[in-house]
Amino acid sequence: MKFISVLALGATATSVLGASIPVDTQVEKFLIELAPGETRWVTEEEKWELKQNGQDFFDITDQDVGFTAAVAQPAVAYPTSIRHADAVNAMIATLSKENMQRDLTKLSSFHNRYYKSDYGKQSATWLQQQVQAAITASGANRYGAKVASFQHNFVQHSIIATIPGRSAEIVVVGAHQDSINGRSPMTGRAPGADDNGSGSVTILEALRGVLQDQTIVQGKAANTIEFHWYAGEEAGLLGSQAIFANYKQAGKKVKGMLNQDMTGYIKGMLDKGLKESFGIITDNVNASLTTFVRMVIKTYCQIPTIDTRCGYACSDHASANRNGFPSAMVAESPIDLLDPHLHTDTDTIDYLSFDHMIQHAKLIVGFVTELAK
């Protein structure tokens, strides 16, 4: 998760079709999209300079020729009332702050989780093992639930956990797993406890909660459920772009995607005299799905919401949106009050509230169950 940028873009942006390949072939270049149709070729170093200045982007270097970003999404009817309160409340009762603290302590202990580093590969492997353990412990694997790697052209892989339902329509919850030290991406210490270890372990604990429901475990939910952990988000939403482009090409149907990017920091709100709240992202999301998310929060969570905007390509929900799938995003706070330690070696567990992270986990359990069951 990053702040909306007011950075003035020095180079002239061009359309994707008009973006010529850079002449200098000695330095690797990447094609990035800073706004719809506005692209530029940059070096890896220039990528991180943009990030340090708060400018988000899609890295579209490997985008298929002929790809067209979705300008509209198919209409989806979302529930307008709560239907599974007893089941959701039973699952919520099993959520554990202790589990999240244990998992985040381990996940943030990797030197970094940079998408090109061995640490990024090791952390993804460890995370996938925890997902597999949750599935196996629930017995859902006996009914077709599974976890799989989604490989990329860099060493860190994305992770997809699938709990089959009666239909192939998919309800997705996602979070990016990588971290970055903005000053030294490859070798710098980047615990990434909040950005985005918090989101990664929050959805992991929510998965454990969802797997307490035998209807879901036994594949009897109306829709299929997927939990995603994306690789390479910091480098331009690489993992989520690849997955949702693959889904688009395969003709998969996604009923809704909820993104969790930074779920643990509340000090910024409290210091401003605000109540602890969710930050509801209102730009580059599906309005109807966001309305549904508000209903889930009001029913199952104990904190209010504040509307906020995060800008173009700010996190992985934008990849779903760009490929024509309805998405929503809920952050730990309004964007201007996010954790100031992100992308540094001080993004540690010490600054986080696990009570707040439990609120996010409750949201996820409610979202998945009300939409899939």
Swiss-Prot record:
Cystine pairings recorded for this chain: 310-314
Enzyme class at the top of the EC tree: hydrolase
Superkingdom of origin: Eukaryota
EC numbers: 3.4.11.-
Residues in the signal sequence: 1-18
Pfam family, one: Peptidase_M28
Keyword Heme: no
Name the UniProt record assigns to this protein: Leucine aminopeptidase 1
Organism per entry: Arthroderma otae (strain ATCC MYA-4605 / CBS 113480)
